[in-house]
Amino acid sequence: MSSGCLALILHAHLPFVRHPEHEHFLEEDWFFEAITECYIPLVRMMQRLVDKHVPLKLAMSLTPTLCAMLRDKLLCERYIRHLDLLIDLTARERKRNRNHPQLRALADFYFEMFCETKRFFVDEYKCDLLTPFRELRETGALEIIASAATHGLLPLLQQPVATDGADLGVPAFASARARSTPAATAARAQILIGRDVYTDTFAAQPAGFWLPECAYAPALDSILQEANVRWFGLDTHGLLFGSPRPRHSIYAPCYTPAGPAAIARDRDSSRQVWSTKGGYPGDPAYREFYRDVGFDLPLDHLGPLAYGVRKFSGVKYHRVTGPDVHKELYDLVAAKKVAETQARHFVEERRRQIDQISATGFDPIVVVPFDAELFGHWWFEGPHFLEHVIRHAANNRDFQLSTPSEYLAAHPTQQIVEPAASTWGENGYLEVWLNPSNAWIYPQLHDAAQRMSEVARGYACPVVEQPRKHSALPSDKVAGGAPALQFDDRVLKQLARELLLAQSSDWAFLIKTGTAREYATKRIFEHLSRFNRLYDQLTTNDVDEEFLCECEFRDNLFPNVNWRYYM
C-alpha cells in the first residue's frame, strides 16, 4: 500500500474590472460568467461532498482582486441584473424552441440553471459568495491560500530589467539575491498587501501562497518568509533545475534558503486535464465553448442582455463534436457520463504513478494545479469531473487526497534547494509577459514604483502636522475638514491602488495574446495617468480633492491598503 498524496490546487483569479462610470461594461461579463459557470458550481460541489461526509481535501487561491469584486455592492447588483437578463432570454428561448424537443430541453436546462443560480446567490448567501468559501475553509475540507495583491508578475516587478535587448523574456536576474530597491519594494508590497487582504477576508494567516503565473526568481522566498508563508507553488522546471538538484525530483517539497517550502507542478498530470487537444476537455461529447447564441441569434432577440453588441451569453446548444466539422447538439447526460469515466481514468493513472514513485522509498506528493476557471467556464463539465475525481480518490486505499500544508506537517524534514527562475507560461519563462508587444510597460511601472517609494519614505514619519493646501478649498482650510495627515493618508493609499492596478500581469498577457488588447492598454495608461497626477499634486502640496474622490470611487479596492510597504 502506498502512503503517497495527491494535492489538487485551484487558482481562482480575475483582474479587477469595475466601471461605475458606465451603465453596462462588456469586460465586467468576465466576472459574471465566472461566478455562474465556475465559482458557484465549485462551491456547491464542495458543499455536497462535505454534506455527504466524502473526504475532501482541496487547496484553492482566491486572489485579492477577485475577493474585492466578490464583496463589491455595485458588481453584485449588476450580477443579479445579468442573471435576470439571462432568465428572460432563456424563457424566450423555451418558447422559440417549443417545437424542437432537443433544443427545448436545452433551453429548459439553462432557464432552470440560471434561476437556481440566482436563488443560491441571492437567497442562500445574501449576495456574499465569500461566506461559503469561509465556511468550507472552517470545515478543514478547503485550504484557501493567498496571492499577490493584483497578480503582478513578481520577477518583473522585483527589479528593473532591460527591455531593449535581443533576449526579452530571459531573466537576467536569475541569480540575484534580495536588494533594497524601489522595484524590490514593489514586489514586496504585492506580496504583503496580498497577505493582508487574505487576513482581512478570512480572519486567519495564510499558510500557502500562489505566485502569479507560478513566476519565481531568487529573493522572492525572503519576502514570502517575511509574510510568514509556509509554502508556495512552482512549475516543474523551477524545482528540477534548482541548486542542488532535488533528491526526490518534483515529488517532495524543498525548503528554500529563506525558509518557505517550494512545491512543484506535475506537468503531465496537469496536461491530461487542461489540454484541449490531448486532454479530457476536448472530448467530442463536451459542450462547445465557442458556439454561443450570442453570436448565432439576431441581436433584437438577444434583447438587453447584448445591448447591441455581439458577445458570449453562456447559452450554448452544441457539443465539441470534432475539429472543423458541423457541431452536433449537446447532450448533457452523455457528457456527464464521459466526465465520470475520465475521472475514474485520472484517479487510476495517479494511483499507478504514486505506487511507482513510492517504490523508490519515500512518500511522494503529486501536485496538480489548475486555473479554477477551467472548471465550469472553459470546460463546462469540469466541476462534475472534479467531484467524481474526489469521490473515486476517497474510495481508494493506495493514496490520499491532501494539501501541501498537511503533507508538510506530516513530513517536516525536507531538502533545502534554491529554485530556478521560472514560470508556468509558454516555454517556462517570461516571454508571454515580456516581449516586443508589451515590453514598453515595464519602464513606466518601474518609474512609478520609484516615485511610490520616494513618497512613502517622505511621508512615513512627518515631524509636524501641517494643513494641506488643495485646489478645492481656500488655502487656510484643511482638506475635507480632516487633519492633514489623514488627507495625506488617503492620497498615499490611492497612489498605492493605482500602482497596484497598473502592475496586474493580466494586461501584459491580454496584449500579447491579442485578446482585449485595446482594453488592457487603456487600463495601464489610465492607472499610471491617475498615479502620476496624484503624485504631482501631492508633492507640490496642491491636491485636487474632487479628482481624488473620483479615483477612490472608481478604483475602490483594498480599503486598508498599507502604503508603508513601499518604504
Give the role of each language-model region.
Residues 460-461, 471-475, 479-486:
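Short, low-complexity intrinsically disordered segments enriched in A/P/G/S/L with frequent Arg
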Residues 49-53, 128-145, 358-359:
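Acidic (Asp/Glu)-rich catalytic clusters
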Residues 222-225:
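Hydrophobic, small-residue-rich alpha-helical packing segments that form membrane-like cores
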Residues 25-36, 107-124, 150-163, 173-186, ...:
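The substrate-binding groove and active-site-proximal loops of carbohydrate-active enzymes
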Residues 162-211, 349-369:
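CE4/NodB-like, metal-dependent polysaccharide N-deacetylase domain
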Residues 8, 58-60, 144-146, 207, ...:
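Hydrophobic faces of well-ordered beta-strands that scaffold small-molecule active sites
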